[in-house]
Amino acid sequence: RVAVVDERCEIGAVYEGIPQNRLGAACDVLSGYPKGPGILTAVRTLSPQVILCDEIGAREEVDSILDALNCGVRVIATAHAATLSELGRRGQIQRLLQSGAFEKLVLLGGGEEPGRVEQIMGAGEFFGKGSGNDDYRSLLFDDRDFPGIGPVPPSVGP
């Protein structure tokens, strides 16, 4: 059971109430919901095992993610930044990572190969990185290994 909180209708591409992107039979899409309230609505009414959302960063969103995790719901979310240094300066992202909310960070490239997995690191490793000219457009936060998928490898090369 998966719930997608799709504030800007980018993930599910819902048209007339039907997701146009294939997200799976056991997936509920909350299209057009603000992420903070959408995450809480999903937890309370849809009983998801996993919630997906994109472009997190606001305090209300982080509060809702922490509430979902406290209820036993796993969360996969993205945050956009040009560099790890930039991401590290965002207080709400720091708060999430320091809370232990996420175990893994998946760094996705930008530029000519958007979405390409550049690196997978433990969330704890993040605080030792970010001083160089890293050029990552998105970070995908994954809080746990998922049954049937197995563990994420510690590093993926170019």
Residue ranges of predicted features:
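Conserved P-loop NTPase nucleotide-binding/switch module
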Residues: 20, 47-48, 52-105, 110
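Short acidic, glycine/serine/threonine-rich loops at helix termini
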Residues: 14-17, 89-90, 119
